[in-house]
């Protein structure tokens, strides 16, 4: 087997290995366990009490009938829902701009739900103290409010006074998108010092994990000490708790494929933070939380601290905006752009840019593909010339094979010397394929993880570019009244991709070696079955790329 065949097979094996590995067996680098700082016993006991105060709501929550709980209604162009005045909990949130599915009567996406529901999911910001004698607002506190509706135009002010006359004021604002700002103010009208700590938590009873879990992160996530921390639900379930000592916490939260809930603490200090798992009475719950250092409020003094909650869709431009506006490090990494981040995000920007002009992400994919093809034209031309030279050298290569058939080392040496003499790169024919692999996966990632591609329509029967082609040849594209099993869902776009790939091969120089030629003939069929379950937007890209390659090959053949 000559070097040309070896290079081809190596490229094919590499490509297939990466594709299958990416979809099924991607293993993220093991997260290094944070070193815990050594403290005195008193501080350790204090921290233990603080963490207990945070974790307990995750494992033992008192359920009250929702009809008995007073609420502040949330109303903006992006959100609707309410905040419970009992415990000041964000536990009712609906995303108005997104539907559950493409059906006509589909309901809006529900993000947060109260504790007595099947999909309990909520966030809260509050205060704790290491002294039991300090009376603070807790989960049973009923707050008073100066308004009934929270909107971007109208913040709400909440207040509560304890038996010592200490006033607790909370001002909540919401922007037109998905960001809440919570400013807590404590007015110490008592004659005692108050040791106060601010905390925030997000608690979730159920996990909405996509089937292709290995190709994107879902679960606890955050930016701690300017490093991205990602733990799957299984990771936290195995560990029970992942603790981070006093650190710079830009944000922590829980992420789904398209949705994110995140706590963004005040930047005035460092925080201890935790990713927790607990199970009680058969109910599993996950929680992320942070807690601030102790702040002593002297008699007659005031203290204020501001935190934020993000709860909504992971729109790229929106996360970028918040990251810049509030200096939230790595906030855009809540979207899992993957290994090729430096390519994937620019690819998205390019698609989104053209979408702004054409109003269709499918057309935007076609335009971006043309640009990528033009950028790679020189490489493709060099590849063609190299393949031509190798084909012309085949008689000489066969002569060398016959001459040194009993000496493999000398055979390889002579062939490489021939390549060097004729200035031929034996792997040049594989370069266009290898270069396209990062581009391919970048487009795949953009289609799979960005909310902008969710339910984005093309033309005809394509109603969601991020989903597989819904048609199949085995029921004549819907003419026959039955649905084949999923592995037979080979639609029109996968077939078009295979046909254009076959035609592209016909336009390219045919390998001189018969074995190599046979391998290439089967590639369209292999790719037909392999890509049929991929997002149809990716198949549109690949088919269009093949058509452009055919045009390009015609040009090269004519002028070379």
UniProtKB/Swiss-Prot annotation:
User: Looking at the Swiss-Prot or TrEMBL record, what is one Pfam family this protein matches?
Assistant: 60KD_IMP
- One annotated GO molecular function: membrane insertase activity
Q: List the disulfide bonds.
A: none
Cellular component annotations (GO), alphabetically ordered = plasma membrane
Q: Please give the superkingdom of this protein's source.
A: Bacteria
> Topology versus the membrane, per the UniProt entry?
Multi-pass membrane protein
The family database entries (InterPro entries) matched by this protein are listed as:
Membr_insert_YidC, Membr_insert_YidC_N, YidC/ALB3/OXA1/COX18, YidC/Oxa/ALB_C, YidC_ALB_C, YidC_periplasmic_sf
Localization (cell) = Cell inner membrane
- Statement: the UniProt record of this protein carries the keyword Secreted: no
Regions annotated as coiled coil: none
* Keyword RNA-binding recorded: no
Q: Membrane-spanning regions, if any?
A: 5-25, 334-354, 357-377, 431-451, 476-496, 522-542
BP GO terms, sorted: protein insertion into membrane; protein transport
Q: Which UniProt keywords apply?
A: Cell inner membrane, Cell membrane, Chaperone, Membrane, Protein transport, Transmembrane, Transmembrane helix, Transport
Q: What is its main location?
A: membrane
Q: Which HAMAP family match?
A: YidC_type1
Subunit structure of this entry? Interacts with the Sec translocase complex via SecD. Specifically interacts with transmembrane segments of nascent integral membrane proteins during membrane integration.
* Family stated for the protein in its record: Belongs to the OXA1/ALB3/YidC family. Type 1 subfamily.
Q: What does this protein do?
A: Required for the insertion and/or proper folding and/or complex formation of integral membrane proteins into the membrane. Involved in integration of membrane proteins that insert both dependently and independently of the Sec translocase complex, as well as at least some lipoproteins. Aids folding of multispanning membrane proteins.
Q: What is this protein called?
A: Membrane protein insertase YidC
